[in-house]
Design a protein with these regions (language model features):
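Short amphipathic alpha-helices in soluble, non-transmembrane regions
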Residues: 32-36, 191, 315-321
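Anion-binding (especially nucleotide phosphate/pyrophosphate-binding) glycine-rich loop
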Residues: 1-145
């Protein structure tokens, strides 16, 4: 019986790994790779476990827990500075490190759970800033080529919460990132209205770097976007669905009923996944299934209790996605990664052809049958 993955994921779900290796020293990576490459099943790399839904049966192969830490700084000339960060370094710690050194470019990513190495996979972003904005290249181990490679940012296929690493799971293990940041006392311009309001500044203003970083943390804590150490929301994986892309007709329909529509830079219009769930009757604290609830702070974050299983959590995701697509015709894409799924597999079981039945014990949970507003 191997080590439980539940002990290494923030949902605290998951059975045993056949073998778990903890990688702490960058210099020993060749030994780790050699040890893991002899098995038929590709190793699964685990960072902070904050975006992972491990199966109840566990994982039949090797799990590599990335626990390398540290970052180095090198001036590149003028105000440009290079930071090389190890993959196991917590992203929040890297942001704090950059801000403390007066380096701008990732200050709006503070407070996001997870490791630095996971950031390029999801192209982690917040408040109009994403890791690809300042990423120069990624150093990774290519399991197909059996060697360490360097990938330029332009080769990483970055998009909204998307990358080549995400679309080809199992091929690369990210070892470190190289970022190009700017030495500046000012943060990037504020582009999100609620953050500007919280800081009492107009949109487009470049506030002091440290002040912006502190405001981001405070805003995330107030909105339930951080990972608490204890309490009913401690077992979670953050937002469980991506904000879905809208067709022109869907965008018009959402705007017509007062729904929020977001655009990141020059990206396509997206609806708020949380807003769609709320239109289906879900609220903070709603019970979705056995041991699975909306967090007490926000609908889009699901939390688990002692009675939860990975199966019940996956079923809850399926139920929510089914209700939204049947009510609004808008499919939702789940965020949590499931170890063992191959390229082309969905993160959640296939949605049933019949409508999911609303859970009668969910508070503030009105029926949405036949309520499609457009």
């Amino acid at each position: 019986m191997g080590e439980l993955l539940a002990d290494h994921t923030t949902l605290r779900l998951g059975g045993p790994a056949h073998r778990l290796l903890t990688h702490t020293d960058p210099a020993t990576w060749p030994d780790v790779a050699r040890s893991a490459s002899g098995e038929g099943t590709a190793p699964f790399v685990l960072g902070g476990g904050s975006n992972t839904l491990a199966d109840d049966a566990g994982y039949s192969g090797t799990v590599i827990r990335m626990a390398t830490h540290g970052a180095t700084v090198r001036p590149l000339g003028d105000d440009l500075v290079e930071i090389v960060a190890q993959a196991g370094e917590p992203l929040s710690a890297l942001v704090a490190f950059a801000v403390d050194h007066g380096l701008s470019g990732i200050e709006y990513l503070g407070g996001i759970p997870g490791t630095t190495g996971a950031a390029p996979v999801q192209n982690t972003g917040a408040y109009g800033q994403q890791i690809s904005d300042t990423l120069a290249y990624v150093t990774a181990f290519d399991w197909h080529l059996d060697r360490i490679v360097e990938l330029r940012a332009s080769d990483c296929g970055f998009g909204y919460r998307a990358s080549t690493f995400k679309s080809q799971p199992g091929r690369w293990t990210i070892l470190n990132l190289t970022l190009h940041l700017t030495r500046s006392a000012s943060a990037a311009p504020v582009t999100y209205r609620h953050l500007a309001d919280a800081m009492a500044v107009p949109l487009g203003v470049r506030p002091p770097l440290a002040e912006a970083a502190q405001a981001v943390i405070a805003d995330r804590e107030q909105r339930g976007l951080t990972l608490p150490d204890s309490g009913p929301d401690a077992r979670q994986a953050g937002s469980v669905f991506l904000n879905p892309v809208l067709t022109p007709d869907q965008e018009s329909a959402v705007r017509r009923v007062g729904g929020p529509v977001h655009r990141d830079q020059n990206g396509p219009p997206r609806a708020s996944a949380g807003w769609l769930l709320e239109q289906c009757g879900y609220r903070p604290g709603s019970r979705i299934g056995p041991g699975v609830y909306c967090s007490t702070a926000r609908t889009l974050t699901l939390t688990t209790r002692e009675s939860a299983t990975a199966t019940s959590f996956a079923s809850a995701l399926r139920q929510l996605a089914t209700e939204v697509v049947e009510a609004y015709g808008i499919p939702l894409c789940p965020e949590p990664v499931r170890p063992g799924l191959t390229k082309g597999s969905s993160n959640v079981p296939a949605m049933p052809s019949h409508r999911a039945v609303a859970n009668p014990s969910s508070p503030n949970r009105p029926s949405t049958a036949g309520s499609r507003p457009w």
